[in-house]
UniProtKB/Swiss-Prot annotation:
<dbReference type="InterPro" id="IPR017261">
    <property type="entry name" value="DNA_mismatch_repair_MutS/MSH"/>
</dbReference>
<dbReference type="InterPro" id="IPR007696">
    <property type="entry name" value="DNA_mismatch_repair_MutS_core"/>
</dbReference>
<dbReference type="InterPro" id="IPR027417">
    <property type="entry name" value="P-loop_NTPase"/>
</dbReference>
<dbReference type="GO" id="GO:0006298">
    <property type="term" value="P:mismatch repair"/>
</dbReference>
<dbReference type="GO" id="GO:0003684">
    <property type="term" value="F:damaged DNA binding"/>
</dbReference>
<keyword id="KW-0067">ATP-binding</keyword>
<dbReference type="Pfam" id="PF00488">
    <property type="entry name" value="MutS_V"/>
</dbReference>
<keyword id="KW-0547">Nucleotide-binding</keyword>
<dbReference type="InterPro" id="IPR005748">
    <property type="entry name" value="DNA_mismatch_repair_MutS"/>
</dbReference>
<dbReference type="GO" id="GO:0030983">
    <property type="term" value="F:mismatched DNA binding"/>
</dbReference>
<dbReference type="InterPro" id="IPR007860">
    <property type="entry name" value="DNA_mmatch_repair_MutS_con_dom"/>
</dbReference>
<dbReference type="InterPro" id="IPR007861">
    <property type="entry name" value="DNA_mismatch_repair_MutS_clamp"/>
</dbReference>
<dbReference type="GO" id="GO:0140664">
    <property type="term" value="F:ATP-dependent DNA damage sensor activity"/>
</dbReference>
<feature type="region of interest" description="Disordered">
    <location>
        <begin position="22"/>
        <end position="46"/>
    </location>
</feature>
<comment type="similarity">
    <text>Belongs to the DNA mismatch repair MutS family.</text>
</comment>
<dbReference type="InterPro" id="IPR016151">
    <property type="entry name" value="DNA_mismatch_repair_MutS_N"/>
</dbReference>
<dbReference type="Pfam" id="PF01624">
    <property type="entry name" value="MutS_I"/>
</dbReference>
Length: 929
């Protein structure tokens, strides 16, 4: 179909599916031509101010995709024009040139080569730009033969590439999911669905409105579809802010639940969706919007999608975005993977296994039975070192068949995808023997289910093994991938083709001999076909009148000829080669059909392989790092014996540092709230985080870094640890802290686990102390959850006398020769000092600053802080001169600290040792004075 005034029935604009007039391009340094209006599309004069037929075609395609940057295929390049060229040149840092003129101005143009376009495409997608790929739908030479020399090649959009619909390995992280999500609000119900187009996994979940943010934080989707009204809801502005650039608003009509239900039922061939789960209207609308959008971007095609799964409310441990960041579950605060919990525990050997592990870490379970089943699978392999090693060796390097299957279903797969599926399926018998025949008894249900999913695929493996050659091209159109002997007809055509090539070589030798030009060559290109090439200085020999050589082309240093004999031979070769390639394409289509006919079974096998990989990886981690199996039940216990921080422990080991100090944590019913005090750098934040991470690991189904752990299921995990401002939204560090604390106090339940660090810092001392005090009381009296609260406000320890479930604990230190040694041990009690000046000294503050700080601290510790601060200010000439003193009463001097210390001593009741200690204390007081 030629694009002029008409357009493809499959091509619809992405933004509401209604064409809009493209915006004018940005300045390029000189006046750039704006796109012509559709009124000139049929004017083919090509004069300045009008458009050529080719440009008319471009503008028709662009008008159908106004919100996409258009990759317009021209030969070996994807070209961009007008405002697209300006945007692409700026984003990709490539040269901006021009092609023709319109309305008295140059038309901006830039391009990227076809053979390396994936890298440029990836950069555009990361910049939040959607790209429509417009391909040539016919051979240019064929177009000229059929419709004349000036014929415009037929082009059509074959795909719209967006951040949530990627399928190519070059554009994806093999070890991470790439989700396309949809969020819908229908009346008072909120539903969310998500799909990984590269694997076909499709899931839906009902949500409370307050859980939209945590759910999106859990998925970290590449793209989110939302009704325009919901996307613009001021109440969701804060929730959606982290997803800026990834929201795709669509008209409300795309989220009609009744149309969606019919669409989904038709797609999966069922009369009702009840068999997949009790989906609500909002969930069905979200699923339907996803399917419609995927079909739109794939221009009428759909990947193989699994039947939708339903994730019920309360099925997973809810963790909000702030907590995920603070705990660095999947990436560090700096945005990198290294140093995160995921990087620490990821010992998987396949891409699918890595994705499943990340999925489980992001969404820990809340059902003790399901958690126990996962732990059984890990435990089975922990105790079987040889089986575990052989299992991992067999899985290592196993191809990613889920993504290969998705590409084949979209018509974008190649011979290597077929080979990948055959290779992975061929390993299944060995894996089954390893697990079942290991002599370890009946495998637990988790591993048994994985083995059932693996299935049996001997017939398909045999077919692919017989059909595919060892050395495979990337694309089927390149040919040469069918193994010799698989198809007799193909073998015959290849023999004819290869014989023709041998005849070409003989003809070249004969012509070189007859003309006495040893350098004469017979070459081939896509324009001239086969031709004879000689140096320009020897061309006269071939141009003799009456000779067999016919001139074809003159270049700067070569001249090209043909002969009738060569042309006839070329026709024979081309015929055989074309027929061989056509037959090979037909065989490829047949093989694809065979594979896609088994798509559901192959998808289950992919899931089984991933489950085995995750179980073996977690078992290997547990055995190597001395992790223990946790007990997870429906109680409210939280009892960790000798727990360790998994990431910090590994970092210390990598740096050959000291061994990590393990600590206990028991949030028993009579001490559900721990108030943790201790010096700076003693390890309070590490202790808080390690207990939260142990809880996450336990509920995802992993062994944990501890000697033992007993955890009653946690429904929500909250963390307020670390300090960071949010200047983009006008938030100070203190404001960010208060927002996160408010979320905790408003959303935590009795089953939640809360860790809070330094609540109240960043404002006046008494303000901060008051907020921290009230927060502790609220956690104790109102929320009644399990909580760890770290603070430097030592005054809070007084709450232990009246809050019966609050227990004070501290990080121990040892003072030795004016030095402070951090023991990193947690024990009962309360700290009386924070040793901040000591930490400042370690940080390298100037000696004069340290000395003055010690002097100020001594004065402040003597009595009332406000009067001490006044005295300190009076010591400074500026303040002393500025503050009038006349008429102000002078407060009576207080008792001298040394006199107070002496008055407190009763020598008659002291042992010799106590007397000696008292003398040392008096000397210390004298030094301070």
């Amino acid at each position: 179909m030629l694009f002029f005034a008409d357009r493809s029935p499959f091509v619809r604009p992405l933004s509401g599916y209604a064409p809009v007039t493209p915006a004018a391009p940005r300045s390029t340094g000189s006046a750039a031509a704006p796109p012509p209006s559709p009124a000139v599309l049929d004017d083919r004069s090509g004069t300045e101010g009008d458009v050529t037929p080719m440009m008319a075609q471009y503008l028709a395609v662009k008008a159908a995709h106004p919100d996409c940057l258009l990759f317009y295929r021209m030969g070996d390049f994807y070209e961009m024009f007008f405002e697209d060229a300006v945007k692409a040149a700026e984003t990709l840092d490539i040269a901006l040139t021009k092609r023709g003129r319109h309305a008295g101005a140059d038309i901006p143009m830039c391009g990227v080569p076809i053979h390396s376009h994936e890298g440029y495409l990836s950069r555009l997608i990361r910049a939040g730009i959607k790209v429509a790929i417009c391909e040539q739908m016919e051979d240019p030479a064929e177009a000229r033969r059929q419709r004349g020399y000036k014929a415009v090649v037929r082009r059509d959009v074959i795909r719209v590439v967006t951040a949530g619909t990627l399928t190519e390995d070059e554009l994806l992280d093999a070890r991470a999911h790439n989700y396309l999500a949809a969020v819908v609000r229908l009346r008072d119900a909120v539903g969310m669905a998500w799909v990984d187009v590269s694997t076909g996994d499709l899931v839906a979940q009902p949500l409370a409105e307050a859980d939209i943010g945590p759910a999106l934080a859990r998925l970290a989707p590449g793209e989110v579809l939302m009704p325009e009204k919901l996307a613009g809801d001021p109440a969701l502005r804060e929730i959606l802010a982290p997803l800026a650039g990834r929201i795709s608003p669509l008209p409300a009509s795309r989220f009609d639940s009744e149309n969606a239900r019919k669409r989904v039922e038709g797609l999966f061939g069922v009369k009702a969706l009840d068999g997949f789960g009790g989906f609500g209207r909002a969930e069905v609308a979200a699923i339907g919007a996803l399917i419609d959008y995927v079909e739109l971007t794939q221009v009428g095609r759909l990947p193989r999608l699994s039947p939708p799964r339903r994730l019920s409310l309360g099925a997973i441990l809810e963790i909000d975005g702030a907590t995920r960041r603070n705990l660095e579950l999947t990436e560090t605060l700096g945005g990198g993977r290294k140093g995160s919990l995921l990087a620490r525990i990821d010992c998987t050997v396949t891409g699918a296994g890595a994705r499943l592990l990340a999925e489980r870490l992001a969404a820990p379970l809340t059902d003790p039975a399901q958690i126990g089943a996962r732990l059984d699978g890990v435990g089975f392999l922990v105790s079987a070192e040889r089986v575990r090693g052989d299992l991992r060796d067999t899985l290592r390097g196993c191809p990613d068949i889920a993504r290969a299957l998705s590409r084949l279903s979209l018509g974008r797969g190649g011979p290597r995808d077929l080979a990948a599926i055959g290779e992975a399926l061929s390993r299944i018998p060995a894996l089954r023997v390893l697990v079942v025949g290991a002599g370890l008894g009946e495998p637990p249900t988790e591993l048994t289910a994985a083995l059932i999913d693996l299935g049996s695929h001997e017939g398909l493996v045999d077919l692919l093994g017989r059909a595919l050659d060892a050395d495979l091209p990337l694309l089927a159109r390149d040919g040469g991938f069918i193994r010799p002997g698989y198809d007799a007809g193909l073998d015959e055509l290849r023999a004819l083709r290869d014989e023709g090539r041998r005849l070409i070589a003989g003809l070249q030798a004969r012509y070189a001999s007859e003309t006495a030009i040893p350098a004469l060559k017979i070459k081939h290109n896509n324009v001239l076909g086969y031709f004879i090439e000689v140096a320009a200085g020897r061309a006269d020999k071939l141009m003799a009148a009456g000779g067999p050589f016919l001139h074809r082309q003159t270049l700067a240093s070569q001249v090209r000829f043909t002969t009738v004999e060569l042309s006839e031979l070329e026709d024979k070769i081309r015929g055989a080669a074309d027929k061989a390639l056509a037959l090979e394409q037909a065989l490829f289509a047949t093989l694809c059909a065979e594979v896609l006919g088994c798509a559901a079974d192959i998808a289950r096998a992919a899931n089984g392989l991933a489950c085995l990989d995750v179980a073996a990886a977690l078992a290997d981690l547990a055995a190597r790092e001395r992790y223990a199996r946790p007990v997870v039940d429906n109680s409210t216990a939280f009892r960790i014996h000798k727990g360790r921080h998994p990431v910090v422990e590994a970092a210390l080991a990598d740096q050959a540092g000291p061994a990590f100090v393990a600590n206990d944590c028991d949030l028993a019913p009579d001490q559900r709230l721990w108030l943790l005090t201790g010096p700076n750098m003693a390890g309070k934040s590490t202790f808080l985080r390690q207990n939260a991470l142990i809880a996450v690991l336990a509920q995802m189904g992993s062994f944990v870094p501890a000697e033992s752990a007993e955890i009653g299921v946690i429904d929500r995990l909250f963390s307020r640890v670390g300090a960071a401002d949010d200047l983009a939204r006008g938030r100070s560090t203190f404001m960010v802290e208060m927002v996160e604390t408010a979320a905790i106090l408003n959303q935590a339940t009795e089953r939640s686990l809360v860790i809070l660090d330094e609540i109240g810092r960043g404002t006046a001392t008494y303000d901060g102390l008051s907020i921290a005090w009230a927060t502790v009381e609220s956690l104790h009296d109102a929320t009644r959850c399990r909580a760890l609260f770290a603070t430097h406000y030592h005054e809070l320890t007084a709450l232990a006398s009246r809050l019966d479930r609050l227990s004070c604990h501290t990080l121990r230190i040892k003072e030795w020769k004016d030095q402070v040694v951090f023991l990193h041990e947690v024990g009962p009690g309360a700290a009386d000092r924070s040793y901040g000046i000591h930490v400042a000294k370690l940080a390298g503050l100037p000696a004069a600053v340290i000395a003055r700080a010690e002097q100020v601290l001594a004065i402040l510790e003597k009595g009332d802080a406000s009067s001490a601060a006044t005295r300190l200010a009076d010591d400074l000439p500026l303040f002393a001169a500025a503050r009038p003193r006349a008429g102000l009463p002078t407060p009576p001097p207080g008792p001298h600290p040394l006199a107070e210390a002496l008055n407190a001593i009763n020598p008659d009741e002291m042992t010799p040792r106590e007397a000696l200690d008292a003398l040392y204390r008096l000397k210390a007081v004298m030094k301070r004075e």
